[in-house]
Amino acid sequence: TSSRRNNEKDANKENILDSEETKKVPKTVLVVEDIQSNFFLVSSILKNKCQLLHAPNGLEAVEIVRTQSVDLVLMDMKMPVMDGRTATSEIRKFNAEIPIIALTAHAFDADRVAALKAGCDDYLVKPINGAKLMQTLKEYGC
């Protein structure tokens, strides 16, 4: 009987751990992208995996992160109104925890370093590789 109780306790612990992990899993991803076709491509890759929000520029992204519940940001670096590096720096002033992943056509090391220095947690290069995008999001809990 004590063995059965221990198994039940272990099962309860696993259920508690599962529910705690579920709470941490990013579910809402903000895609900051000014080119509609790129947003549609990301949307099709992430379809049914995350709830998506969209901002066409960095200024709107900062406002969305400030006012809505967002778990992860995919940030284009070159956009009108406010670029991705500036938006990332602004977000970091009030939210140091949210994962921000640069998603950009700029593939040079200097661009990568600049994005990471601005506060991005990771860096993905366009054209978008669906498998790489999914693997990266999985690493951040989505």
Where is each model-derived feature located?
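C-terminal catalytic ATP-binding subdomain
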Residues: T1-S19, Y140
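Active-site beta3 strand of CheY-like receiver
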Residues: Q68-L74
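Charged docking surfaces used in two-component/phosphorelay signaling
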Residues: F40-S44
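Receiver (REC) domain active-site loop signature in two-component systems and cognate sites
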Residues: M79
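C-terminal output helix
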Residues: I128-L137
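Short hydrophobic/Thr-rich beta-strand motif most characteristic of the beta2 strand and flanking loop
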Residues: C50-P56, I64, L124
